[in-house]
Structure formats: C-alpha cells, structure tokens
Amino acid sequence: MPVIPALWEVEMGRSQGQEIETILANRSHSDSTPLPNFLSGSHRPECCTCRLLTASGAQDSLPFGRRLYSGPWRSCEEVCHVSVLSVLSTSCGLSLSLPIFPGWMEWLSPDIALPRRDEWTQTSPARKRITHAKVQGAGQLRLSIDAQDRVLLLHIIEGKGLISKQPGTCDPYVKISLIPEDSRLRHQKTQTVPDCRDPAFHEHFFFPVQEEDDQKRLLVTVWNRASQSRQSGLIGCMSFGVKSLLTPDKEISGWYYLLGEHLGRTKHLKVARRRLRPLRDPLLRMPGGGDTENGKKLKITIPRGKDGFGFTICCDSPVRVQAVDSGGPAERAGLQQLDTVLQLNERPVEHWKCVELAHEIRSCPSEIILLVWRMVPQVKPGPDGGVLRRASCKSTHDLQSPPNKREKNCTHGVQARPEQRHSCHLVCDSSDGLLLGGWERYTEVAKRGGQHTLPALSRATAPTDPNYIILAPLNPGSQLLRPVYQEDTIPEESGSPSKGKSYTGLGKKSRLMKTVQTMKGHGNYQNCPVVRPHATHSSYGTYVTLAPKVLVFPVFVQPLDLCNPARTLLLSEELLLYEGRNKAAEVTLFAYSDLLLFTKEDEPGRCDVLRNPLYLQSVKLQEGSSEDLKFCVLYLAEKAECLFTLEAHSQEQKKRVCWCLSENIAKQQQLAASPPDSKMFETEADEKREMALEEGKGPGAEDSPPSKEPSPGQELPPGQDLPPNKDSPSGQEPAPSQEPLSSKDSATSEGSPPGPDAPPSKDVPPCQEPPPAQDLSPCQDLPAGQEPLPHQDPLLTKDLPAIQESPTRDLPPCQDLPPSQVSLPAKALTEDTMSSGDLLAATGDPPAAPRPAFVIPEVRLDSTYSQKAGAEQGCSGDEEDAEEAEEVEEGEEGEEDEDEDTSDDNYGERSEAKRSSMIETGQGAEGGLSLRVQNSLRRRTHSEGSLLQEPRGPCFASDTTLHCSDGEGAASTWGMPSPSTLKKELGRNGGSMHHLSLFFTGHRKMSGADTVGDDDEASRKRKSKNLAKDMKNKLGIFRRRNESPGAPPAGKADKMMKSFKPTSEEALKWGESLEKLLVHKYGLAVFQAFLRTEFSEENLEFWLACEDFKKVKSQSKMASKAKKIFAEYIAIQACKEVNLDSYTREHTKDNLQSVTRGCFDLAQKRIFGLMEKDSYPRFLRSDLYLDLINQKKMSPPL
C-alpha cells in the first residue's frame, strides 16, 4: 500500500491550515501532482502535524474534516495499526488532528494502543507505571471538583512551576471542556494571568452533565498565550472520567501534575502529600522566601575555564551545588558547596531538575550568571551556657543519596514525639563537645578553612532536651574500619593508615561507620553511637563490603556496643531472607565474632537493624544440600527451636558464609560451655534457665548523678567478666529486662537490692534483710538495656516508674511478698566499660570510687506457679487467679482481649517460633500485688508505626531471643496443663483432637519422666500407671461442676466452653461468605484466633470496634469512643494501625469533626473488603477450618 508523505512545512495561520485540509482531502494515493510551495521544503520548528488515516487496501484516502485541535506535540514518527486503519503520525512542534468521520476522533498515543475501544471512552484504562521524572517538568495545578445533581462544580485555584516549551514569558490560562465534544459552546476558560509561572486563578465553573456524557472525560488544559503569536501553546493537561466524578464518595481536591498531551487525555495524577509537606529544615525550605536571617542571595558570574565551569550540581527542585573544584573558575568567582541555584542567566530555575539545568549550563559558551541562595549558620545560646549551632548543610553523603521513596512515618500537622523527630543539632559546649540529634543519621563537619579533623570530643553534660545522645570519647588509634582486602587489591578509598592522613576527619574518601541509637527519653545515653570496629583478621577472603554502612538501631532492637575490641566484624553479605513460604526479602547480614545482625538497606549506605541480635553460642547452622543455595540458621526461643531460611546468590557466597558461621559458632559454643564444677550449683529448675547477657556493665565507671535516669548497659570487655554465680552456669550475666524464672527455692529465699558495700567479686552477692512490709521495692520490667539506679535506696527507687519515659507499660511496684510467693536471689551486674581514667581525661572531674555491683532480684513465680504452693491450693486457686488475671486485662487499654492463662508456664511448647514471656501484675493469694509471667502472643508485625507505640517492652515480631542463651545442654521438660488452662485453650482452639492429644501427651522431644504437675492430685495421677483412668479424670473437667457452691463464678473460658460448637455442616456455611462467618459467634471466635496466628487481628478488632460503636446511643460517649478508635486503629503510627489509604484516613478524620454513627463506614468497608480478599481465603484453607469441616462425631462427655 502506498504511503502518503506526512510531513510538510506550512506557514502559521488559520487560513493556511484550512487550505491544507482541502488539499489533502482531494488528494489520492495515486495523485502525483506537485504540492504547493508552502507544503515543500525543509521544515521549521513551527511546522504542523498532519495525521493521515487510510483504509488498508483502499485506493483513495478518506475525506478529512476540519481541524480540531492545535498545540505543542512531542516529535514522533511511527506507523500504528488499529483494526484495519493505518495511521502515520509525524510532528515537529504543533499538532493538527483530523477526524476520519464525524463523532470519532482518534488521538493515538505512540505507546498506548487500545484494542477495541477508543481512548476517549475508555473509563478505566490499563494501568501504566509513571515515573516521577515524566511528570515533573510542566508544573502543577491545584483544583477541586464536586458533583451536585449531575452538575460538576469546578474550582480552579492556582498553578505552580508552570514551564512552557516556547521561549519567553509565560501568560497562562486554563481551559475546561468535555471530550469528545463537537460543540465549542461548552468550552470554558479562565482569565489570562500575564507573565507569571505561579498564577492564582480562583475561578469557578459549572458543567451540567447529561446521561449520554457519562462515558466522556472532563479535560483540563493549561495554555500559554504567547504575545508574539496568535497561536497558544499547550503547557500541560489532565482529564477525569465523568462517571467517576458523579460517584458520591469521589473527592477531587489538591495539587495535580500537568501531564503531556497523550498522557493527560487519558488520566490524571495527584501530587503525593509527602512532596507537599512543609520542610522544617532551613536547608530544605524553598530559598528566597523572605527568611533573610538564615540565608542571603548572591549573584555570581562564572567564566568558562579550560575544563568547564569547575563545579558539580545535585538534587532536583531546587538544584544545589554539590562540589566546587579547588582553584577552578567557580571557586575563584565565590561559589561554595551547597549553594542553592535560583536563577541561571536571569531565568528562574528553582523548579528545574538537575539534568535539565546541567544541559543548559553546558550549552552556555562563555560565562554564566548564577543567582544563588546561601545559608547562614544560626547561632543561639544552648544548654549549659554553650552555643547551639544549627547545621547549615547536609553531609556530602546525604546529597549523594536519593530521597526516600516512601515516608510512612511522616506526621501531617502533628507534633512528632521525641523518638520520631528528625532534627539535626550540633551543640558545642565550653569543652568543644559534640551532641547528636536522636534520630539523625549522622552529621559531618563541613570543610572550613582547611580544617580536616574533628574537634576534640569530650563527655559533655546532658542537655535539657531529651532528644540528644552524647558521643563518647574517641580513640583514633586502633578502632578504624578497615575492610578486608587481599594484598594486591587494595582500593584507593580503603583508608590505609600508611597514607598519613588523620582518620578522625571527614574527608571525601574517609567515611566512618556510625551507629545511631535512640534515646527513648534518656539524656545520658552513653553507649558510644560512633562505632569504629577494629580491623578484621579473618581468613574468609574479600567479602566485607567496600563502603561502610550506617547501622540504625530502632527503638525495638537491643542496642549493642560495637566498639568492644573483643567483637570483630567478620563479614557483611547481602542475602535473601525468606519470611514465609514464597516471600523473600533482601537483607544484609553482618556477622561478628559472637553475634549476627540482620539489617535491611532501605537507602544506600543506611542499614536498619530488623531484629535483636542472634548470639552465635545459641544458634545452629544447617547447610542443606550442596546444589541448593538455601541454608538455615536455627536458634532457641523459649525452649523451642526456630529458624531463619537464607538464600545466597551463588555457591561461592553460600560456601563462604557457611564456613564463617560454622567455625565461629563452634568457637562461641565452646567458650560458653559450663565448667564442670558449676554443676553443683544447678537446681531442679534447670528447664527454666535464664538467658545470659552479653551487654553488661564493666567495673571502674563512675556513679551517675542522682538526677539522671537509667542508662543502658554496654558490652562487657574481656578481662572484666565476673565469676559465674550459682544461677548463671555459663558465666554470663542475666539481662536487666529478662527476669529469670525458678521454681525450686521459692519457699526458702528472699532478697532485695543490696547495699553499696556488696562486693562484685563474690559468686553469690550478699543480700540485705527484706524491708518492712509497708515499704515497697520496685519489681519493674525494664526495657532492654536499662536498669534501675544502683545507688538509690528503696524509697528513692520507688518513684522510678513516675519519672521514666519509656514505651514500656510501667508496672506498679510489688509489695514485700511471703516466701511462698516470691523469692529474690541476687544477681550481680557488671559495670560501665569506660574506665575511670578515661572519664577523668574526658570531664576533668576527680575519679570516683568504683561503683558497687548492683544485684538484680530474680523474679520467681508466685503461688500460682509454685509447686509447693500449688500443692496446698489446688485447682481452685489456679482458676481464681486465671479469672482475676482476665479481669485485670479487661480493664487495661491497648491490651488484647484474650491472653493465655497465667497459671501454666509450660503450656503448648512446640517446635515453631514462640515469643518471650512478659511480666504482669495481678492479685496474689493474700490480697497483695504479685508478679506473674505469661507466655502470651504479644508482639505485632502489622506496621512499623505500631512498634513505636507498643505498650509492651522494646521487642520485635520476629525476635524471640533478647539475649544470648545458656548453651544447648539445658534440660527441658513438659508439664501437664492445669484444668483452667486446658479449658481456656481448648475453648479458644475449637477443642480439636489434635490439641487434646497435644495437651496430654506433650511434644515428644519435650516430654520426659520427670514432668512437673500443677498440684498434688496431678502428681498422684501421673505416678499411676493406669492411663485410661488418668484420661478419664482429666476429661472430667468438661462436666458441669455445680457440686461446689462456694466456687467462684465462671469466667470467659467457662462461657466459651458452654457455647455451642458447630457441626461440620454449619462450618461449611462459613465458606459461603464472610458475613455468615462473622454472624456466627463461634465462627467469629475461630476467625479471630486464626488472625491472631497471622499477626493481623487488628483488622477484625477494628471492624468489631466499629460495630460496637454503632450501638452507642449517648452522643458524648460516641465522641470519646470515636476518638479512641481513630487513635488506636487509623491514626498514623497507631499502636494497631490498619492498612488504609490516605484518602480514607483523611475522610474519616474529617468525619470526626461531627461524630455520627456512620463516620467509620468507609474505613470499615475498606477493612472488610481487605479481610474478604486476603485473610478470609487463607482462613478457608487453614488447618483450623479444615479440622472443623472434617470433624467426626465426637463421643459424649464422660
């Protein structure tokens, strides 16, 4: 088929354009008559585009109608095939689109082809990934669209950063129309704003919409009315589907990108809110905004030199100077690093991208004139009479790093909490000390006057602002990070000391690894945030990453002392971590000589620690087959084995990592082996051996002032380990937050914190006599890395929960308990790693006396757990305590409704992952407060926002070992569950035979001959050899026990057991819809139990809370309950935040201004749909549901 030439040069003007249409309409394929003069010759940039459409195989071309649209067009030349039509599209600046028959208009995009429906009527086009670079150039338009009675109400508010493709001034106006539309009578437009790239329109328009217009689109275009030409130029456009605008819940309001012609006619794109967030940092604010006290404008003329202008740029909107060549033209002209470019040759460029500005600068032949904005350091009086100097620049590494793609933790209009602040402070006191903001990654000192070294760091006094951590003194001698290289492959940036540089400086080629650890409200956090591990001396080859990483420890991760010379970084490898069966995540594994750190590199050079460290002495390695790239790391968590599945990228990497891990695991387990003479100190409670602590306190540190709060522990250096005491067979000290358990000596030993004269070198530190009964001693569950002040007496430490700021729920202090309830054998704690000599050199204060060892009381089990007390009280005491624990938990906010029973700490031990015990308060047998340990599922993984407000201790969902455990030789036993525990758990899990057999037989690996019962009756039955009688007696708890009139009323577990268990036919009906499942009481309980195992129960809890909210009648109660639901489930970083989009969150927030019963309807509908698509199908495939529908007819109760 012959092809008609599609590119002719034409003169601008309406009459010539009409003449083109006439000529082309009368010209056929075979016509060889010459074209007019204005249609021949070389084309100029002003030429038009003619779209020629011919039918395949047709001899004559179809007639063309009048011209419909003119505007700028991207240069393209491509033949597209749609159905039987061949389309040749060529453009060189302006577009002339011609229809082939009335009512059909084809605006074909070169990269979008719609197979059956034209793109005018395509209401839901196929999704296409749009990068931010494609939509950043033309500018943005702010508008709002509302619909009332089939009338569209448009409010064109303002524009921003409008950039026209034509040179000269920009005179913008906005044009609105419905497409496709033949009549021009319905086109509306705003007034023209002369010479303004940020125009303010504030005009309203009304568009009545008929039923036949539902398939059309509302087109909003922004034009530039050029003064030197009659033809306007298109700046950008966007379009909205009319049918979607008429829906009641559709809301169009805010900033939208101006897209290109092809893209804008089919879709619209809203500017993300994170890109509109007001920038708090003075450096990141839009320059030139009248903030003259923080900066100034400078006009700099830079001539082109031999090698260019002599500077590099970075960042987008605005562009900043990244580096200035020493001695180059830019430096001689006065340009400095981090200057913000406002204008280039008197042309505004603050909204330009870096690539565009670089291309424009390169095209300048002789010189450039820059208008730049330069930050002026702001000096303010700081705490303690020092000088507070806000950082006037980012580090070079920050500028090279790309911006965050997703900022989930941004708070809009809400003051951030101290642990969420992103402030960056440099505080210099009289001793030239440095303090660093709590969450800032790191701050580097800019190059000033040839200074390449850091000022001398010293121990500064704690500021009043809690959002500070103090940099510990640095020893620049032997703690430099030197990656492992082979002798012949040492790169230039390796930082070799042989070059004679001072490596305390922050030059371009020497970056230090720094560890930022959060404050959580403590002003004297002394745990050395600048980490410089010493050089490794391993033989595992070249596999330490070349660039140092910034390790960030979140609030839920146990901080580490990586400065310890006994700890060596062996390797750093990028591996795949399998979180589920098919879900894998890219992680960076840091293997030290004694532990493993799993991190995720969200940004280049920045690694967020995902979980608490795994100590090598408590892990095992399974390499698997040699052909498979996967290998497993097993670890102990509450006497159950858990594992991580890792996958290497190559066989060499797997062999390297496995070799390193297996060798060092063997070393650490050999070092952690208990000495033979320590066996004499082991008790019968060997199955409850406490976790050993790596992070202790070393001797020789001075006392903390009485006004300071607790400081976290640091790593115990070699040579300062205390001798093993009788409760720590492995020679390790217990964690301050891990209260070890014991069940043997509960009736014979008591204890309280020792006096200051307790010597730290004893195996068993002496304990004072217990205080009087009316005095209280704190028994608080502290987070990891914190401890009470050792030098305070009980009266002072009694007020510790009131002054401590921590996300952990502060428990009230417990009273002095009788020996049958609590016993407190002493635990010696090591002291700070810094010697008094270092403190003397740092602060200038005289050395203080060595701090006496602080004895941490060991939390024993109360009468509910004690074997002897259990023998005296029996089953009734267990049930009474269980019901009291439920009543306490029901009254607490933020707690889950159903917790595991506290009367049995050995319930349900399996080989899958379990979570650590928590300490809770409850009523003791004699009315006093007591401590009880429950093994409930407390940790959450649904969002990172919830981890910051978790009411429990600092923990992570995948974390099951807060500290290193004792060794592998710990004997483990399985005990028969108590009746109340059995009833509660069987009622929760549906009473399947699998759970029933698991309760009475236990795990094969855990069961043994010396199982410990709950009471004397259970012990007697266990000794008997008649298994049938044993089972009959145990199953007797399912009878209605009306024979005990003095027994307490039945709790929630009894009510659940009395509920009707559905048949398999009823359970099958649950698979028809989620509504039928939630209506059934038993189905709701089973579904909630399933979601708890999936760590997504917050969705159902939110849905149930909304259902309860609709039943509230009082308006005052409704308002308070609505705020509580929003703060707990919907607010950003809520403790149980559900997965909602930003529109639903903002819509619900607006509804709270006037609270009604339906203010949560949209959010509840979204969560219901999420459960219906995600959780509900998984529940139908779960073993729990399959057991219910496949259950056999059970025998009647005995």
Swiss-Prot record:
Residue stretches of biased makeup (Polar residues): 739-751
Biased composition range(s): Basic and acidic residues: 679-697, 907-917
Comp. bias intervals (Acidic residues): 877-906
Composition-biased stretches (Pro residues): 753-773
Ranges where the RGS domain occurs: 1073-1198
Subunit structure as annotated in this protein's UniProt entry: Binds EFNB1 and EFNB2. Binds the GNB1-GNG2 heterodimer.
Name by which UniProt lists this protein: Regulator of G-protein signaling 3
